[in-house]
Amino acid sequence: MRAETSSGSKRTFKTLRTGFLGLVGVIAVYYALLFIFGIKYLNPQYYGSYFYAWRVNFADKLMTHGRYKLIKKNEHPETEDRKRFYRISQDKEGPYLIRFDRPEHFPRGHEHQFSLNFPAYEDFLKVRERFIVESEGLQENMKLEHSDLMEQMKKEKGGLFFASYSGKSVEEMMRILFPNNNADRNPWFDVSNILIRAVSRIMSQDEKDREGYLFDGSEVGDDLMKDIREGLDALDRSAGDGDVLLSEKISDADIKNFFINNGRVSGTPQETFAYSRLYYLFNFLTAGIEFKSERLAELRGDGESSNEFREARMDYVANVFARIFASIYPNQHKKDVSNIGVLEKVRNYYSPKMTVDPEKEVDDADLELVRESFSRSSRISA
């Protein structure tokens, strides 16, 4: 009797073990397929669709809703990188992230934002601050003492989103952001001009204009690569003694990987942070455009100063920018999958999501507004 019981227990154990190992095997195969088809060997023909759906469905919220939180100065080891970031984020010398509780992107969390700091970041925060002050008429806030700003941050509960600036053209926004022909020699002036040129070419109805700004899945268009290199050179003007130059640190291969990784929805913190700089500039430059989106039109009726409208507008502009960015990829933002074969269906099952909620889709009329606004904008000389 005992022998039978012992034998039965062994069979039960073997069955459970086999079942457990089988389950582990199935899970391992599933995640292996996710890695193979979802990251490693994604078909470049789908990059635009994957990228657009990823940004609109998930990633953009980190840019539009990110908020800075106070860092205790002695909470972490005082490395040189931490001290430099503390100086431009909440110190008396440069309280750029505590003066106004507005969106910022923290891919590694606010406590580790120092690891993404670079010489031209402070200049970017100056542009951001100027946009907030001018678009919201907050000149008086610039007079607040540092102690007042610190207390203000401790009491803030859910800050405002960026405002619109109705009626301002792209050219006018450039003059507002960089007054007196960029008298401060802010390098983001040049980057903004490059962005204007790139967007106008990417959205051009002339295929010859678009040709040099496309990414075919393996190579970056010559004109696009040239613009990126020009932008990096401009940002290097903020570098001090001992700073690593971006133009030397970032190779052509890194630039190519930027587009590949975004297409594979596997961007690094540095790559997503670079993307968010471009989005914010785009948001500032398009602040005066009155988009025709029905959702925004409804909220606009309650007043453009309402935080609900601001939030919806920021989210919408992020979707517009993602749509423009996606258009540099093969098949742009929407690959036709109606006639694909069985193997492609299996591949797409394990690949990133390609569908976007219709309510989040961008109105084609608004894309046309952006195209016209940027194509009319001429380069403003400093």
From Swiss-Prot:
Keywords: Membrane, Transmembrane, Transmembrane helix. Its main location: membrane. It is found in: Membrane. It is a single-pass membrane protein. One of its GO terms (cellular component) is membrane. The chain crosses the membrane at residues 19-39. The keyword Membrane applies. It comes from the Eukaryota. This is Uncharacterized membrane protein ECU07_0530. It comes from Encephalitozoon cuniculi (strain GB-M1).
